[in-house]
């Protein structure tokens, strides 16, 4: 029975992370999601959280250092 619970949880998580739907707002601005600890250079390229996952932020591509 435990195996069924684990299998269901795995399948549920697999369908949640479809790459086609990930971070559309950030990508439309030419950005990419980085961990919040990363510094966006220049600071004007930091778009904030937008639609990135929890504790991540959107920076213009190539600016995450």
Swiss-Prot record:
It holds the Pfam family Myotoxins. The record marks 23-24, 55-56 as: Involved in the interaction surface toward Kv. Negative results: has no hemolytic activity. Has low harmful effects on normal mammal cells. Does not show activity against the filamentous fungi A.fumigatus and T.rubrum at concentrations up to 125 ug/mL. Does not directly affect voltage-gated sodium channels Nav1.1/SCN1A, Nav1.2/SCN2A, Nav1.3/SCN3A, Nav1.4/SCN4A, Nav1.5/SCN5A and Nav1.6/SCN8A. This is Crotamine. It comes from the Eukaryota. A motif (Nuclear localization signal) lies at residues 24-40, 49-61. The keyword Mitochondrion does not apply. Monomer. Belongs to the crotamine-myotoxin family. Its main location: secreted. Expressed by the venom gland. Disulfide bonds join 26-58, 33-52, 40-59. Cationic peptide that possesses multiple functions. It acts as a cell-penetrating peptide (CPP), and as a potent voltage-gated potassium channel inhibitor. It exhibits antimicrobial activities, hind limb paralysis, and severe muscle necrosis by a non-enzymatic mechanism. As a cell-penetrating peptide, crotamine has high specificity for actively proliferating cells, and interacts inside the cell with subcellular and subnuclear structures, like vesicular compartments, chromosomes and centrioles. It penetrates into the cells as fast as five minutes after its addition to cell culture medium. GO terms for biological process: defense response to bacterium; defense response to fungus; envenomation resulting in occlusion of the pore of voltage-gated potassium channel in another organism; killing of cells of another organism. InterPro entries: Myo_ane_neurotoxin_sf (IPR023355), Myotoxin (IPR000881).
């Amino acid at each position: 029975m435990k195996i069924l619970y684990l299998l269901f949880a795995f399948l549920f998580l697999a369908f949640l992370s479809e790459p086609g739907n990930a971070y559309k707002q950030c990508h439309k601005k030419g950005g990419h999601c980085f961990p919040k600890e990363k510094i966006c250079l220049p600071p004007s390229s930091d778009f904030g959280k937008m639609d990135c996952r929890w504790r991540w932020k959107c920076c213009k591509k190539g600016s995450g250092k």
